[in-house]
């Protein structure tokens, strides 16, 4: 044998071979044929079982025998892949109508593996035989198998639209398919309507075929997605579990799941829900139990008392496979190539296949009827001259001589002569003559009917309709999946996601924030808070994990931080810097922090800047869903800083204190509500080179404590403050000195909650009791507390 050596580039060889491989796996492995809805391995399994007599009316046979037949005759691949395909055809949670009945463990909805093929037994289901019916009547083309030892069908007759009824899923080179299963009665009804009116629209078809009908049931949402898929082959729907509510004896409620989305692994779903419970991602679930038994699927989710079951349901829909999105991608092999097809194209392709199948069957039956008619006519003629025929046969040498004599003497045909010589003597009675004449009449009618079907297209379509109606009547079942027109928007209450727990929120002046358990706080005490050198506590208060923290900075921005997102850190340990939660600028400083339980309130914030601007904005404006970056609270002009943020439930007095000792007190009712991006209005009429040190709310029972740079503290009562109008100069609180005058560096409104003060220089701090500071008159500079020569110039004061 001579060798042919070709000199080819690697790129050409790889491209050519991969092209061949891709074509093979597209056409011969992963995608179904639009006509019978089967992939090649599925078709070969069903045909092997049918041809070996492993039908529904016979006993079950070992699966291993079928797998062996398929591998040996039609599908030269691994036994495991053939067995897996065979098992899938028997799983009633994968197929809307199973094509194989199987005894033994054929897997489960938990994705458990089936028993080995040597243990399970199988046979064709009754419906599967409708796919194969009339296959022996030359209805479809056969091709040689892989080793040319036998023939296999290119496609099955498929007497019902299996592609739509059982759907298909698969991935090949460059193509994937996801066709959902449908209700058999609905699909057949839609096909019948298409036969009556080939111009029927998708909208009209959807009166009969409502949408997918999954074997696992569930609730389908989104008619628009179904319509889009039926029109174009692509679309998206939502499939959610069927969930009911039960009340237990102890008063608790539990959610009972009886149907889950198609192709969702039940055990994985149960595990996921239990993980959400264990990780405290959802609050209100006591226990998750899989109570599935032979009576049906059942998952029980026991809830705590007084929880909102609807919110928990919504959370699970969003965060587990209790609800999934299903994407139609209706790709099938049509005319030898993959095509994305809408429902009209699929039905049209199926109908054309049925026209061909019924026409071929009719031709086959007509041919047989005509052949039998010819024989019957010969037998009737022979019986009419029976004595002569018998005498001729007796005088013949042998069977061959008898046949030749019959043909020559009485002009019988070869086929008629063969039938006559094979005729048994007991058939030569008057009864058989009558029977033959009756058969002749029946054959005449049959041939006329068959010719009418072949000559008349409408008659052929009527045959298809009658046979489809028979299958519909025999195999119809109620719809399992409920269809809802709209996709429901899922709203989740925060209470469901976050366990309710009282904690201590703390913020330091240097911007370190944390939440601490009440237990850790009580075990330590306020003084033992973890701090960096030079840092001090700005604020601490009891909050709930379901609250939201608003952190305000000198740049007029705020950080929106849900309390549950704060790190849970022990009281004695250092907190987390806010910049690690939300990025802020290097020179940005935290000036105050508040918690909000509900933004639906009439409360408001007041913002005051160093250069004397002020603004009021209502609390609801600060609600947001963006946590990842700072947001605008107020517009701060260049060379200005936000220095005070206050929160009030209703209008009240505020006092403004400046560096040069001026004070203006007025009511917040003078401020109009403004948006977050507004800069506000003038708060106080500042002197040259003066600036605001603090703006705080004040009431009649309060006192004002002020610290000067020279180490003096001055405390005054509310009555010294004179209530005036906004934007005035205000009153003087210090005695002006010509040399080294006192300047206020810090001031606070002292309420009944405050008892201590702390003075700060760059390197020192001094603590004392507020009540030790006697109240002063208006025009004094207070009392010296520290010697600045030793302590350093005072730069700040903190009260607690």
From Swiss-Prot:
<dbReference type="Pfam" id="PF03989">
    <property type="entry name" value="DNA_gyraseA_C"/>
</dbReference>
<dbReference type="Pfam" id="PF00521">
    <property type="entry name" value="DNA_topoisoIV"/>
</dbReference>
<keyword id="KW-0472">Membrane</keyword>
<keyword id="KW-0238">DNA-binding</keyword>
<dbReference type="InterPro" id="IPR013760">
    <property type="entry name" value="Topo_IIA-like_dom_sf"/>
</dbReference>
<feature type="site" description="Interaction with DNA">
    <location>
        <position position="88"/>
    </location>
</feature>
<comment type="subunit">
    <text>Heterotetramer composed of ParC and ParE.</text>
</comment>
<dbReference type="GO" id="GO:0034335">
    <property type="term" value="F:DNA negative supercoiling activity"/>
</dbReference>
<dbReference type="GO" id="GO:0006265">
    <property type="term" value="P:DNA topological change"/>
</dbReference>
<feature type="site" description="Interaction with DNA">
    <location>
        <position position="94"/>
    </location>
</feature>
<dbReference type="InterPro" id="IPR050220">
    <property type="entry name" value="Type_II_DNA_Topoisomerases"/>
</dbReference>
<dbReference type="InterPro" id="IPR006691">
    <property type="entry name" value="GyrA/parC_rep"/>
</dbReference>
<dbReference type="GO" id="GO:0005524">
    <property type="term" value="F:ATP binding"/>
</dbReference>
<feature type="site" description="Interaction with DNA">
    <location>
        <position position="39"/>
    </location>
</feature>
<protein>
    <recommendedName>
        <fullName>DNA topoisomerase 4 subunit A</fullName>
        <ecNumber>5.6.2.2</ecNumber>
    </recommendedName>
</protein>
<feature type="active site" description="O-(5'-phospho-DNA)-tyrosine intermediate">
    <location>
        <position position="119"/>
    </location>
</feature>
<dbReference type="GO" id="GO:0005737">
    <property type="term" value="C:cytoplasm"/>
</dbReference>
<keyword id="KW-0799">Topoisomerase</keyword>
<feature type="site" description="Interaction with DNA">
    <location>
        <position position="77"/>
    </location>
</feature>
<dbReference type="GO" id="GO:0003677">
    <property type="term" value="F:DNA binding"/>
</dbReference>
<dbReference type="InterPro" id="IPR005741">
    <property type="entry name" value="TopoIV_A_Gpos"/>
</dbReference>
<feature type="site" description="Transition state stabilizer">
    <location>
        <position position="118"/>
    </location>
</feature>
<dbReference type="GO" id="GO:0009330">
    <property type="term" value="C:DNA topoisomerase type II (double strand cut, ATP-hydrolyzing) complex"/>
</dbReference>
<feature type="site" description="Interaction with DNA">
    <location>
        <position position="75"/>
    </location>
</feature>
<dbReference type="GO" id="GO:0005694">
    <property type="term" value="C:chromosome"/>
</dbReference>
<dbReference type="InterPro" id="IPR002205">
    <property type="entry name" value="Topo_IIA_dom_A"/>
</dbReference>
<keyword id="KW-0413">Isomerase</keyword>
<feature type="domain" description="Topo IIA-type catalytic">
    <location>
        <begin position="31"/>
        <end position="495"/>
    </location>
</feature>
<dbReference type="InterPro" id="IPR035516">
    <property type="entry name" value="Gyrase/topoIV_suA_C"/>
</dbReference>
<dbReference type="InterPro" id="IPR013758">
    <property type="entry name" value="Topo_IIA_A/C_ab"/>
</dbReference>
<dbReference type="GO" id="GO:0019897">
    <property type="term" value="C:extrinsic component of plasma membrane"/>
</dbReference>
<comment type="similarity">
    <text>Belongs to the type II topoisomerase GyrA/ParC subunit family. ParC type 2 subfamily.</text>
</comment>
<comment type="function">
    <text>Topoisomerase IV is essential for chromosome segregation. It relaxes supercoiled DNA. Performs the decatenation events required during the replication of a circular DNA molecule.</text>
</comment>
<keyword id="KW-1003">Cell membrane</keyword>
<dbReference type="GO" id="GO:0007059">
    <property type="term" value="P:chromosome segregation"/>
</dbReference>
<dbReference type="InterPro" id="IPR013757">
    <property type="entry name" value="Topo_IIA_A_a_sf"/>
</dbReference>
């Amino acid at each position: 044998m001579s060798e042919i050596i070709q000199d080819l580039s690697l790129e050409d060889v790889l491209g050519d071979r991969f092209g061949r491989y891709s074509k093979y796996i597209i056409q011969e492995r992963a995608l179904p044929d639009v006509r019978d809805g089967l992939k090649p391995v599925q078709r070969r399994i069903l045909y092997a079982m049918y041809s070996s007599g492993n039908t529904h009316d016979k006993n079950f046979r070992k699966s291993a025998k079928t797998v062996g037949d398929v591998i040996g005759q039609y599908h030269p691949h691994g036994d495991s892949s053939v067995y897996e395909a065979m098992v899938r055809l028997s799983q009633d949670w994968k197929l809307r109508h199973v094509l194989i009945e199987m005894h033994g463990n054929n897997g489960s909805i938990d994705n458990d593996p089936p028993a080995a093929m040597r243990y399970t037994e199988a046979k064709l289901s009754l419906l599967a035989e409708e796919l194969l019916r009339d296959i022996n009547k030359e209805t479809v083309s056969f091709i040689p198998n892989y080793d040319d030892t036998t023939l296999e069908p290119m496609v099955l007759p498929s007497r019902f639209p299996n592609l739509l009824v059982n759907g298909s899923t698969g991935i090949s080179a460059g193509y994937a398919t996801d066709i959902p299963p449908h209700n058999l009665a609905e699909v057949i009804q839609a096909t019948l309507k298409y036969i009556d009116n080939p111009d029927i629209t998708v909208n009209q078809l959807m009166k009969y075929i409502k949408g997918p009908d999954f074997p696992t049931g569930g609730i389908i949402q989104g008619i628009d997605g179904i319509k889009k898929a039926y029109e174009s082959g692509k679309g998206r729907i939502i499939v959610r579990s069927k969930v009911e509510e039960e009340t237990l004896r102890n008063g608790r409620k539990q959610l009972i799941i009886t149907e889950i989305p198609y192709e969702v692994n039940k055990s994985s779903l149960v595990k996921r829900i239990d993980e959400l419970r264990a990780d405290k991602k959802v609050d209100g679930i006591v226990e998750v139990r899989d109570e599935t038994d032979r009576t049906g699927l059942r998952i029980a989710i026991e809830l705590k008392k007084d929880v909102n079951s609807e919110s928990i349901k919504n959370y699970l829909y969003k965060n587990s496979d209790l609800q999934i999105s299903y994407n139609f991608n209706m790709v099938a092999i049509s005319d030898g190539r993959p095509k994305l097809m809408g429902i009209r194209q699929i039905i049209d392709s199926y109908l054309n296949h049925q026209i061909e199948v019924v026409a071929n069957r009719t031709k086959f039956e007509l041919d047989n009827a005509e052949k039998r008619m010819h024989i019957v006519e010969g037998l009737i003629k022979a019986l009419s001259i029976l004595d002569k025929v018998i005498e001729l046969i007796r005088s013949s040498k042998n069977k061959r001589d008898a046949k030749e004599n019959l043909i020559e003497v009485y002009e019988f045909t070869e086929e008629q002569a063969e039938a006559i010589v094979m005729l048994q003597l007991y058939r030569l009675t008057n009864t058989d003559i009558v029977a033959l004449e009756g058969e002749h009449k029946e054959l005449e009618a049959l041939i006329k009917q068959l010719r009418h079907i072949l000559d008349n297209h409408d008659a052929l379509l009527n045959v298809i309709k009658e046979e489809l109606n028979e299958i519909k009547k025999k195999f119809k079942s109620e719809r399992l999946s409920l269809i809802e027109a709209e996709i429901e928007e899922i709203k989740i209450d925060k209470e469901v996601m976050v366990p309710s727990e009282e904690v201590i929120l703390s913020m330091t002046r240097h911007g370190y924030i944390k939440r601490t358990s009440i237990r850790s706080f009580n075990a330590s005490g306020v003084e033992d808070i973890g701090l960096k050198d030079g840092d001090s506590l700005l604020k601490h208060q009891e909050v709930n994990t379901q609250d939201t923290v608003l952190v305000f900075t000198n740049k007029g921005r705020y950080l929106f931080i849900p309390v549950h997102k704060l790190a849970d850190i022990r009281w004695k340990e250092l907190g987390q810097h806010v910049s690690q939660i939300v990025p802020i600028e290097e020179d940005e400083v935290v000036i105050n922090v508040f918690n909000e339980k509900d933004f639906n309130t009439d409360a408001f914030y007041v913002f005051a800047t160093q250069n004397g601007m002020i603004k009021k904005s209502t609390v609801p404006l600060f609600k947001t869903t963006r946590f990842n970056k700072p947001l605008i609270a107020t517009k701060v002009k260049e060379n200005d800083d936000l220095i005070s943020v206050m929160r009030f439930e209703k209008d009240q007095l505020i006092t403004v204190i400046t560096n040069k000792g001026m004070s203006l007190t007025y009511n917040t009712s003078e401020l109009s509500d403004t948006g977050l991006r507004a800069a506000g209005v003038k708060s106080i009429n500042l002197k040259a080179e003066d600036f605001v040190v603090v703006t705080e709310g004040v009431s009649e029972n309060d006192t004002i404590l002020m610290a000067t740079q020279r180490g003096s503290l001055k405390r005054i009562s509310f009555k010294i403050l004179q209530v005036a109008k906004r934007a005035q100069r205000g009153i003087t609180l210090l005695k002006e000195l010509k040399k080294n005058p006192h300047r206020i560096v810090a001031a606070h409104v002292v309420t009944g909650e405050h008892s201590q003060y702390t003075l700060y220089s760059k390197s020192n701090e001094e603590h004392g009791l507020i009540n030790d500071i006697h109240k002063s008159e208006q025009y004094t500079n207070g009392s010296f507390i520290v010697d600045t020569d030793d302590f350093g110039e005072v730069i700040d004061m903190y009260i607690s």
